[in-house]
Amino acid sequence: MAKKTVAKIKKKSKNIPNGVAHIHSTFNNTIVAITDVDGKVVSWKSGGTSGFKGTKKGTPFAAQIAAEQAAQIAMENGMRKVEVKVKGPGSGREACIRSLQAAGLEVTKITDVTPVPHNGCRPPKRRRV
């Protein structure tokens, strides 16, 4: 029995001039999601999807590569200006912002949206190494 060929639908590139880059940086990984102004995701990458495994996902270099790849896809969709919202205490925060600028996106505003507890949950205990 012959296999049926399925026609692949090619994605049309949209023209989105402005957007928002959401950087979620934890100690273990960094996730970069670039959305349009309404919040619809245009592209996203993380340390893991960029080819890093284990503890290397949390490094600034992994965050830099993830931001470059996400910015490349966003620029293919016509994005030129981006507003950056950074969340979390990780090491890839600054590396992501620098990488977005180096990729050719114009950063208009940088906002820190890290959630701060008003004495909510008990934090994890200190590591003894």
From Swiss-Prot:
GO terms for cellular component: cytosolic small ribosomal subunit. GO terms for molecular function: rRNA binding; structural constituent of ribosome. Coiled coil: none annotated. SUPFAM superfamilies: Translational machinery components (SSF53137). PROSITE patterns: RIBOSOMAL_S11 (PS00054). The keyword Ribosomal protein applies. One of its GO terms (biological process) is translation. The keyword Cytoplasm does not apply. It comes from the Bacteria. Keywords: Ribonucleoprotein, Ribosomal protein, RNA-binding, rRNA-binding. InterPro entries: Ribosomal_uS11, Ribosomal_uS11_bac-type, Ribosomal_uS11_CS, Ribosomal_uS11_sf. PANTHER family: 40S RIBOSOMAL PROTEIN S14/30S RIBOSOMAL PROTEIN S11 (PTHR11759). Part of the 30S ribosomal subunit. Interacts with proteins S7 and S18. Binds to IF-3. Belongs to the universal ribosomal protein uS11 family. Located on the platform of the 30S subunit, it bridges several disparate RNA helices of the 16S rRNA. Forms part of the Shine-Dalgarno cleft in the 70S ribosome. This is Small ribosomal subunit protein uS11. It comes from Fusobacterium nucleatum subsp. nucleatum (strain ATCC 25586 / DSM 15643 / BCRC 10681 / CIP 101130 / JCM 8532 / KCTC 2640 / LMG 13131 / VPI 4355).
